[in-house]
């Protein structure tokens, strides 16, 4: 698979039994369907992200998994973080620094979990100064 932003080959990193794909060029991360939910423990960390979710704005970037054009949408309603999502395979692309923003958003809710922080740290360590 190649990075949708800079076209560099993505490297696979195993983090807490999940194989994430990261770009050594632009430092983005690809999450296949449901990997993001596992990493941030979505059911516990964030309010219902499907509520108020509508189709995103089309981008020129191809999905690294299925080559469908990614769409840009808000990660959660009422927040400013925009992420790229594949409307076909439902994977999510986070640009460099966006995983930390996900952690900040998760920390603002009633019962935040620390998995997103652990995952970001492990990616940083395994990727050798990733962030």
Predicted regions located by residue number:
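Short cysteine-rich clusters marking metal-coordination/redox-active sites
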Residues: 3-6, 23, 63-66, 86
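The feature marks the first
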Residues: 1-19
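A broadly conserved sequence feature marking short terminus-proximal activation segments
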Residues: 17-56
């Amino acid at each position: 698979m190649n990075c949708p932003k800079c076209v560099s080959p993505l490297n696979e990193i195993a983090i807490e039994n999940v194989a994430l794909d990261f770009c050594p060029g632009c430092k983005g991360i690809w999450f296949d369907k449901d990997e993001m939910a596992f990493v941030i423990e979505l059911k516990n960390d964030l309010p219902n992200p499907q509520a108020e979710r509508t189709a995103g704005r089309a981008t020129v970037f191809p999905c690294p998994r299925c080559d469908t054009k990614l769409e840009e949408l808000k990660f959660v309603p009422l927040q400013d973080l925009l992420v790229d999502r594949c409307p076909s395979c439902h994977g999510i692309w986070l640009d460099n620094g966006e995983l930390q923003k996900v952690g900040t958003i998760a920390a603002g809710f009633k019962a935040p979990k620390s998995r997103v922080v652990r995952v970001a740290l492990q990616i940083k360590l395994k990727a050798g100064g990733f962030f």
